[in-house]
Amino acid sequence: MHNMSDIIEQYIKRLFEESNEDVVEIQRANIAQRFDCVPSQLNYVIKTRFTNEHGYEIESKRGGGGYIRITKIENKDATGYINHLLQLIGPSISQQQAYYIIDGLLDKMLINEREAKMIQAVIDRETLSMDMVSRDIIRANILKRLLPVINYY
């Protein structure tokens, strides 16, 4: 059985498929009511599964008529998406942000499950056992070297 976050994620992705558009607008209260969950559950899904690293932009308006507008970033080809990711990676990157990038690569079928697990193992904090600042810098450098390889092979 999937957890509530998985169910909400699949629902939002289905909205994209059904609309044939690159933009979906949802209302927090409606989604929370539909899935009998608190609005913060929806916020969690948006913040972790529809990130820039996954290829989405989020616009949010709070209040009575508030909405969340989720836009697919228009990168129809692998090169455009890889270049987008390379621009997102600064001089350092946290393990969580790096995992979001790996999830995005998996979602776009640029890597398979096995490759994703190998990349995660290489950039994991246990593998890079050093101070956090150095670890995040090395993780960013690894990803910056790895992404072009994924693009060309």
UniProtKB/Swiss-Prot annotation:
One of its GO terms (biological process) is stress response to cadmium ion. Induction: Up-regulated by heavy metals such as Cu(2+) and Cd(2+), but Zn(2+) and Co(2+) have no effect. Forms part of an operon with mcsA, mcsB and clpC. One of its GO terms (molecular function) is DNA binding. Keywords: DNA-binding, Repressor, Stress response, Transcription, Transcription regulation. It holds the Pfam family CtsR. InterPro entries: CtsR (IPR008463), CtsR_C (IPR041473), CtsR_C_sf (IPR041908), CtsR_N (IPR040465), CtsR_N_sf (IPR041902). Belongs to the CtsR family. Interacts with McsA and McsB. Negative regulator of clpC, clpB and clpP transcription by binding directly and specifically to their promoter region. This is Transcriptional regulator CtsR. It comes from Staphylococcus aureus (strain NCTC 8325 / PS 47).
